[in-house]
């Protein structure tokens, strides 16, 4: 019988994490459970830094970006002894389960705790939208709005100067954020990790656009594919058009979450409590076709594949 739970945020922050914490806390309290917030993710779990939360602890949090519990990278959590200390800390406080909000690294920590006998529920919190078993992650749509706003501003100045602009978008090894932003921002060219990249082919496409009368262009590219400053120099040398690169960086993670992320986070947080009360542990929550779903967290990490939105890319190419 679940009586006390913990909740933490881990890895890179994402808009909507506070809304998810709020959803977990208020749904749990409504069901008569006690909730402890863990500061700074798995690091705080190991260092036994927890605080009991009530309804007022999460007041005015639904609209705040970031995570008021804090987050930290803690690679030492891979060590089984470190996890044993974390589990002992939770048991000392009488915790029966843990809700983890974060990306795939956070899920891995939850998976390892589950394998050691401590039930966890994972909620997908990352702007990268790279979590298996869900159509969208908490924070993705807010970050999308931030990126599109930046692209709109870049288009203003690119048009004025007949310039080629490269905009580097977060996403790690998933191109969803780049792809969605490129469609919404009307970018002429898209470079994502799921599709083989050739700078020569990109230049050929840019030249073809110039031949058709294009005065300016925006290239959206996912981070880690190449050095965008070097790419800008190459494009400028080959096209004889002024080319500049803009790295949006961590601004994409900040800001007040948009309505969809607030709703998604709230629904997922409450659903996590439903699952725990039904006796489910070792699960991760997702949304598919606008319905909340849950999967075995071990299976999600080890066996499930995340499909690439190839139809989105096909659409974008038709609109160049």
Swiss-Prot record:
The places in or outside the cell where this protein is found are: Cytoplasm
Please name the GO terms that the record assigns under molecular function: 6-phosphofructokinase activity; AMP binding; ATP binding; fructose-6-phosphate binding; identical protein binding; metal ion binding; monosaccharide binding
Where are the active-site residues found? 128 (proton acceptor)
Instruction: Give residues annotated as binding ADP.
Output: 22-26, 55-60, 155, 186-188, 212, 214-216
> Any inhibitors or activators noted?
Allosterically activated by ADP and other diphosphonucleosides, and allosterically inhibited by phosphoenolpyruvate.
- Per UniProt, substrate binds at 126-128, 163, 170-172, 223, 244, 250-253
**Keywords from the UniProt entry:** Allosteric enzyme, ATP-binding, Cytoplasm, Glycolysis, Kinase, Magnesium, Metal-binding, Nucleotide-binding, Transferase
Identify the enzyme class: transferase
Q: Does the keyword ATP-binding apply?
A: yes
Residues holding Mg(2+): 104
Using the record for this protein, list the coiled-coil segments as residue ranges, or answer none.
none
Give the protein's cofactors: Mg(2+)
Q: In which pathway does it act?
A: Carbohydrate degradation; glycolysis; D-glyceraldehyde 3-phosphate and glycerone phosphate from D-glucose: step 3/4
Q: Which InterPro entries match?
A: ATP_PFK, ATP_PFK_prok-type, PFKA_ATP_prok, Phosphofructokinase_CS, Phosphofructokinase_dom, PKF_sf
Residue sites binding ATP per the record = 12, 73-74, 103-106
Entries under PROSITE patterns matching the protein:
PHOSPHOFRUCTOKINASE (PS00433)
Q: What does this protein do?
A: Catalyzes the phosphorylation of D-fructose 6-phosphate to fructose 1,6-bisphosphate by ATP, the first committing step of glycolysis.
Subunit notes for this chain?
Answer: Homotetramer.
Q: What is this protein called?
A: ATP-dependent 6-phosphofructokinase
| Species whose genome carries this gene | Enterobacter cloacae
């Amino acid at each position: 019988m679940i009586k006390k739970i913990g909740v933490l945020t881990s890895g890179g922050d994402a808009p909507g994490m506070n809304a998810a914490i709020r959803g977990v806390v208020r749904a749990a309290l409504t069901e008569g459970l006690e909730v402890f917030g863990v500061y700074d993710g798995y690091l705080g779990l190991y260092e036994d830094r927890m605080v009991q939360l009530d309804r007022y602890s999460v007041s005015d949090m639904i609209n705040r970006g970031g995570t008021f519990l804090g987050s930290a990278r803690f690679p030492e959590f891979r060590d089984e002894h470190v996890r044993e200390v974390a589990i002992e800390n939770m048991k000392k406080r009488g915790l029966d389960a843990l809700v983890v909000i974060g990306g795939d690294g956070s899920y891995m920590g939850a998976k390892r705790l589950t394998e050691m006998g401590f039930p966890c529920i994972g909620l997908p919190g990352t702007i990268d939208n790279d979590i298996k078993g869900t159509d969208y992650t908490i924070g993705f749509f807010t970050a999308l709005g931030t990126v599109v706003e930046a692209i709109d501003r870049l288009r203003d100045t690119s048009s004025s100067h007949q310039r080629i602009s490269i905009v580097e978008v977060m996403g790690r090894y998933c191109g969803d954020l780049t792809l969605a932003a490129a469609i919404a921002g009307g970018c002429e060219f898209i470079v994502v990790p799921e599709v083989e990249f050739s700078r020569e082919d990109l230049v050929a496409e840019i030249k073809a656009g110039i031949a058709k009368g294009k005065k300016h262009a925006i290239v959206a590219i996912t981070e880690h594919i190449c050095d965008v400053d070097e790419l800008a120099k190459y494009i400028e040398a080959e096209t004889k058009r002024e080319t500049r690169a803009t790295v949006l960086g961590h601004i994409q993670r900040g800001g007040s979450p948009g309505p969809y992320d607030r709703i998604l986070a709230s629904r997922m947080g409450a659903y996590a409590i439903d699952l725990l009360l039904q006796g489910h542990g070792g699960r991760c929550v997702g949304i598919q076709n606008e319905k909340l779903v849950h999967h075995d967290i071990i299976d999600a990490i080890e066996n499930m594949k995340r499909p690439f939105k190839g139809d989105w890319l096909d659409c974008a190419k038709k609109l160049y």
